[in-house]
Amino acid sequence: MSTQPLVITLLGPTASGKTALALELAERLGLPVINVDSRQLYREMDVGTAKPTAEQQARVTHHLLDLRDPNQPITLQEFQAEATPCIERELSERGIALLVGGSGLYLKALTSGLKPPAVGPQPELRKQFSAMGQAVCHPLLAAADPIAAAKISPADVVRTQRALEVLYASGQPMSGQASVEPPPWRILELGLNPTNLRQRINQRTEQLYQDGLVEETQRLADRYGADLPLLQTIGYGEALQINDGSITRQAAIATTCQRTRQFAKRQRTWFRRQHTPQWLSEQDLLTEAMTLIEQHLG
């Protein structure tokens, strides 16, 4: 058995039940949860990101939530600079760490040692890209850096702008600047992929709207402007349309469900291609996960 410390990553598409299982695992193992959900890194974005509630955060310590305001974008490099010391601290103290999230690129960067381009935020460029609109920006990226564009959804405003930002600021495509330096950890990937995911997505979407997604979106728009890139993401974009009167609540819910299903499909594809998780069977998730963890701990 290797003496290297163990990093457990709990991954799966949105609405697959990661939060509930993470809380149980964290309590059983006496660990905090290290967040690897890109939208939960931002303050004030609580309902729309299904961020762990205050009660859940009181139950189990969570790291890497609420790092910045929504108008202060976090690059992958900056996220790694926050996350890596957090992981190393847990490994030093406990010999084990628990990462939880559905942001595949962020997980991959941490577990494989991907080193993204060292290009800082470029606010003026981002303003220009926002003014151009995603319908122009993604094709522009596809023409200039097709490798990067192929890995980014045409609807993903934040990552599209980041790839263009790197390209324009450095003069080199983002796809050609990344390198890999594997970390000195063992990785155990546990995957959730429930057969009833469509139903779970529908139920969670209804719950987000009941919990105040529309009101949260209005507060964010009032404070940061409706053109905030994060307000174009799933759920927030539809809530904006409710607030400006261009869509009904039921139509917004239906669109959010559809966009979430499409996103979950892309997540599943990413996890199959980029990760090698031990898929949990849905029967007794906690027992099965603990058995796998104990086997790796020896």
Swiss-Prot record:
Keywords: ATP-binding, Magnesium, Nucleotide-binding, Transferase, tRNA processing. It is an enzyme of class 2 (transferase). The record marks 103 as: Interaction with substrate tRNA. Its EC number is 2.5.1.75. SUPFAM superfamilies: P-loop containing nucleoside triphosphate hydrolases. Pfam families: IPPT (PF01715). Disulfide bonds: none annotated. Substrate binds at residues 14-19. Residues 37-40 are annotated as: Interaction with substrate tRNA. One of its GO terms (molecular function) is ATP binding. Its cofactor is Mg(2+). ATP binds at residues 12-19. One of its GO terms (biological process) is tRNA modification. It catalyses: adenosine(37) in tRNA + dimethylallyl diphosphate = N(6)-dimethylallyladenosine(37) in tRNA + diphosphate. Catalyzes the transfer of a dimethylallyl group onto the adenine at position 37 in tRNAs that read codons beginning with uridine, leading to the formation of N6-(dimethylallyl)adenosine (i(6)A). This is tRNA dimethylallyltransferase. The gene is miaA.
